[in-house]
Amino acid sequence: YTYPFWWESFRPYLYQNCTPEKKTYDLIIIGSGYTGISSAIEACSQNLKTLLIDQSALGEGASTRSAGMVSGGLNLGKKINLFQEYGNQIATDFIRESIDSYRFLEDQINGHHNDVKYQKTGRLVLAHSKKKVEALKKKTELLNSLTNLKLEFLKDVNHEISNDYYKGGMLVHDAASIHPSLFYKFLLNKALRCKLDIF
């Protein structure tokens, strides 16, 4: 059995602090990944009596296994055209909400960048064909018209990456890396300071 590289810094563990039988809760959350534990922290901040349930070690699933590259608004609509599927207003709202989630993350870890190994790295999205270059150029223009991401379309990417393969790219300044397991530890410590029942 092998475990993820990220667990060398923090390994998920089994934890219970209650026996929930015959108790009443305002909210029961099933699953203790990023979504579950973040929801539990928010619920506790609103004085909701909350129970967080997980059958496995806390954060053992995808949250502490996936590479920690973060940005907002870039990957929406990979499989479908959001604007055709949902219309202009809802598609625009999706994109802006995604960007807001990135800002929310930055607010949550403010003052704790070293604890979670958060670094503003930027991101380079590359295109390998003329068709992909045109699509990326349109995406850059669209996102710049809807947001304040200040994305840069690059006809020549050789000053970013030495290659003979890629025909163009999009430079994203507002992107970062975070250590997924240490970020989970940060959230877990926050949750354990709340009046939160975990089973």
Regions found by a protein language model. Give the residues of each.
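A conserved short coil-to-beta-strand element within the FAD-binding core of flavoproteins
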Residues: 154-163, 197-199
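N-terminal Rossmann-like FAD-binding beta1-loop-alpha1 element of flavoenzymes
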Residues: 24-52
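Helical element adjacent to the flavin cofactor pocket in flavoenzyme catalytic cores
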Residues: 134, 141-142, 165-199
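Extreme N-terminal leader/targeting segments of oxidoreductases
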Residues: 1-27, 45
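Dinucleotide-binding Rossmann-like beta1-alpha1 core, especially the glycine-rich loop
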Residues: 73-156
